[in-house]
Amino acid sequence: MADKSIAFIICVNDETYFEECLFYINRLRLPDGYIAEVYPVRQAESIFQGYNMAMQQSDAQYKVYMHQDVFLIDKDIIRYFLELFEQQPKAGIAGVLGTNRYSNERSFSEAGIWAMCWDAVKGKHFTIICRKNRLWRRP
């Protein structure tokens, strides 16, 4: 596993949004020694199938799963996530949604969703960064 590699796995069905998403990824300030890889997911049967395929193609320790219309405007957001993982060694996933307990079903609806919002956002957004590989499945 590539310890200092970060894979951005992005579902794409609109190239204009994807290009803007890439613009912000390319402006991120990654910690020294870290590299970014981008895995666009196009024409997958489902978002879950697409994420699983891209996850298996990458050996990056950290994988950022996101939609094409998410723009990472805070240039240090990856550093914040890496610091969070360092401070919380048992954490394996962080992002827009989270839970205070583990569900064997891996279903947010059964796991008790909680969230902490750093900034107000409008619209539907999806960004999750994982330190460990977990298969995605339909809820």
Describe each PLM feature range.
Residues 67-71:
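The conserved acidic donor/metal-binding loop of glycosyltransferases
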Residues 63:
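Short aromatic/hydrophobic "clamp" motif used to bind/position activated sugar donors
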Residues 113-139:
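Short, flexible, basic/aromatic active-site loop/helix in glycosyltransferases
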